Amino acid sequence: LSLENTSALSAELPAALPYVLTLGAALCFSSASLIFAQFSRRLSVLWVNTVKALVAALLLVPTIAILYATGLAPAVAPDLTSLGLLALSGALGLGIGDLFLLDAYTRLGVSRTLILYGFQPIGLGLVAAIFLGQAFPLGKLVAVIFLIACLIIFSLERYKESGHWEIKGLLNALIGVSLDSTGVFISRLAFDHSPELHPLEGHFIRCLGALSCYVVISCYYKSRGEPHRRIRLLEYWRSLEPTARRWILLGCFGGTYLSLCLYLTAVRIGHLGSITAVGITGPMFAALLEALIHKKRPSRYLAAAFVAFMIGFAVLLLN
């Protein structure tokens, strides 16, 4: 696959832009994850995932229409290869992967689950170097090491607090992270195959892929005589009070629509391994928000993680 068009686009943009976009995406996603975890415990993981994919898809329709009307994006239909790749990416990463992740949220907590994203940059960076021809210089590797150090610090803190890891929750988190990484890589393949494709168009196709996956899962439960495990979209929605409805909609807007719009834009124009490294700062944001919500004073572990993050981010921008 040729990267000439993508490289040319990246050369015209500020070098720090992909990292700023990824940082914003991480903040949106980690904040929304706290909301998703609460409603997953209260209702069901399948329901929350369906709602967030549906809300994102509905928001993307007018957004893409505005892009077409203003000429910011060409109204070019993606070819079947890119369409299939993005749908597969949505089904695996945004669909099945998020089912495992949200289940892990309910078992391990948001911060602990997001810690496992620390193992994502090395794998994705190497895959990108092998299959996409992207360089992975020593400077970027040093930055990734500092960024992963943030998560090791958080991991140590959580282990000292609990003394153990829940095996099922840990396995679900690992599976979710792996599927999410696969989805990110497939999305990049689709964008490289169709450079004219706008990230929001890709995000919309991914949402449709995820929704299709959820419908299949729901039908599977029905065929097995387990109707209580189906999506039950309207039933659960009607059971929520107005305040709860506003919170879940806010989480869907920030965590699925805005965060992935920012992240897919960064994936399209930036270095895949480095972008993923910045994206793993989500646990830091989640831990900060949890501290504010529960009115707990930030620990020395949090301060140390921030120092490691700032050093790694500085190295990243200099390379």
Which stretches of residues belong to each language-model region?
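Glycine-/small-residue-enriched transmembrane alpha-helix faces in small-molecule transporters
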Residues: 1-47, 58, 164-201, 212
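Alpha-helical transmembrane segments of compact multi-pass small-molecule transporters, enriched
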Residues: 55-59, 116-131, 145, 208-213, ...
